[in-house]
Structure formats: C-alpha cells, structure tokens
Amino acid sequence: MKGGKRIQSTRQNRINSEIRAHEVRLTGLDGEQIGVVSLKEALEKAEEAGADLVEISPNAEPPVCRIMDYGKFLYEKSKTLKEQKKEQKVIQVKEVKFRPGTDEGDYQVKLRNLIRFLEDGDKAKVTLRFRGREMAHQQIGMEVLNRIRQDLDELATVESFPNKIEGRQMIMVLAPKKK
C-alpha cells in the first residue's frame, strides 16, 4: 500500500513544526544572537515571545532560525517587491510614421511626439513609407531621415540607420541619451 499524498507547502520558509533539524542557530525578535539550541527549546522561546520560529537558511549547519511574526514578515516582503516593481521602467518602442512628402506642419507635430517619447525614456522607431512613384525618389526619404536625426541630435542616439530601402520602407531606431 502506498503512503498518503504529502501536501507540499507553498511557503518558501519552513515555520514552527515544519522545521526538521534537531538543533538550530537561533536569532531573537530584535535580531540578537541567542546561539545554538535544540529545536524544542527554540519553539518554546518563540511561543513565549508570541511569535513564530522561521527557518531563514536551511542549508547552513546548523540551520539558522529567527523568532519573528511570520505574517508581518510576508507583508513587508511583498511590500518591498511591489516597490521594486513600481520603480522598474519597462522600455517600449514607440513608432512614428513619415512619408517622403510629409509637410512642414505634420513634420513638426510628429517631431514633437518623437521628443515626448524620448524624454519619457522610450525608444522611438521612425518608419518612412514610400508609395507608388515615390520609390523613384529614395534620396528624398534619406534627406527626411537625416533631418530627423539632426533635429533630435541632443536628445537621442541612432541605434540603427537604414543603408538601403527594405521593401517599401526605411526604418530608423532612436534611443534616448543617458542623462
């Protein structure tokens, strides 16, 4: 007959009766070192303090355990993880499309958008699309891309600049300069 299924704990740290060692290196509520004590004695001290006995590093010899309020510990841990996640900035690639015949007013609006994207810390992808007979005037497209590059010179560095046309478009990628 097979043994019963063992329910695997989802906790990262073993607490109280889950700890398997006979002796543990104990740390008190305020972080003071108590020393190497038996598991039974450590559990008694934790109960006296009205807290949990938490195994901090199970691979140490003997395992290191701390007397603490486990619920509060988990709350603090999740709080710090949320803070770290909030501070992380995900860099996105924003795309702005131009045409060889893009007029001055439209050019300025699109340039303003590019500046905003770069100031927000995002990368910008400039796509220059050729339609119909515009393919015959590829040098106009290169002039537009060079003008964009010059206008954004103090804000961005060019990550990739097209040497030749790919299909019916030229693509330039800009990254914000580090401050």
UniProtKB/Swiss-Prot annotation:
Predominant cellular place of this UniProt entry's protein: cytoplasm
Disulfide-bonded cysteines: none
GO BP annotations, alphabetical order: ribosome disassembly
Concerning Pfam families, the annotation shows: IF3_C, IF3_N
User: Is GTP-binding found in the keyword set?
Assistant: no
Localization per record: Cytoplasm
What is one GO cellular-component annotation here? membrane
Query: Which residues are marked as site: Important for 30S binding?
Result: 107, 110
The answer to keyword Protein biosynthesis applying to this record is: yes
The terms under GO molecular function for this entry are: ribosome binding; translation initiation factor activity
* Keyword list, A-Z: Cytoplasm, Initiation factor, Protein biosynthesis
Q: What does this protein do?
A: IF-3 binds to the 30S ribosomal subunit and shifts the equilibrium between 70S ribosomes and their 50S and 30S subunits in favor of the free subunits, thus enhancing the availability of 30S subunits on which protein synthesis initiation begins.
Which PANTHER family does the record cross-reference, listed alphabetically? Answer: TRANSLATION INITIATION FACTOR IF-3, TRANSLATION INITIATION FACTOR IF-3, MITOCHONDRIAL
- Assembly and oligomerization: Monomer.
Q: Which family does it belong to?
A: Belongs to the IF-3 family.
Protein name in UniProt:
Translation initiation factor IF-3
Species in which this protein is naturally found: Proteus hauseri
